[in-house]
Regions:
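Short, conserved DNA-binding cores of transcription-related domains
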Residues: 1-90
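Short, positively charged, Gly/Tyr-enriched micro-motifs
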Residues: 1, 63-161
Length: 162
């Protein structure tokens, strides 16, 4: 039984293989629209096809499982521009990213504000937020200032977190 002052160890402590971590909870998220405005000319564009994207989000601390967002999105075709485009998901995650903005923000904050090195920051994200992020990914985010695809400012190699 849990109580004040009683230590309950993390059941995942000591796991060295990522595949042994608890399975994620899948949360369905829909951005599949029949029509949407074209970002170039603002004309209504009809849905061309649908797709799915898997995003890792901050986990559920009550169940101890990570949370994965399964985002159903639509791809559209504009007759006027003759261009294809996907529905905008930039409020959830950067283009091409596997993690949500919330995960990226927490990871960069843990390293830059709390001063944790990258490997302990990776463990901290798992222990306190139930999201597994490889330490090299955290390093890339910190060196890019939290922006995917951006370059480190001024130097070739950042010394932050080392």
């Amino acid at each position: 039984m849990y109580g004040p002052g009683r230590y309950e160890p993390d059941p995942t402590e000591g796991i060295t293989n990522v595949k042994d971590l608890p399975a994620p909870q899948l949360v369905a998220y829909h951005r599949d629209h029949k029509q949407t405005a074209c970002p170039r000319c603002s004309q209504l564009a009809s849905r061309h096809k649908s797709g799915q994207r898997l995003l890792h989000d901050l986990g559920d601390l009550c169940t101890g499982h990570p949370v994965d967002l399964l985002v159903a999105y639509s791809s559209h075709y504009c007759d006027r521009c003759t261009k294809h485009f996907n529905i905008d998901l930039s409020d959830l995650a950067p283009p091409g990213a596997h993690y949500t903005h919330r995960v990226i923000d927490v990871a960069v904050r843990v390293v830059s504000e709390d001063g944790l090195p990258y490997r302990p920051a990776s463990w901290h994200l798992w222990r306190d937020h139930r999201v597994f992020v490889p330490f090299a990914t955290i390093q890339n985010w910190v060196e890019a200032g939290g922006k995917k695809g951006a370059r480190a400012h001024g130097r070739r190699v950042s010394r932050v977190g080392t």
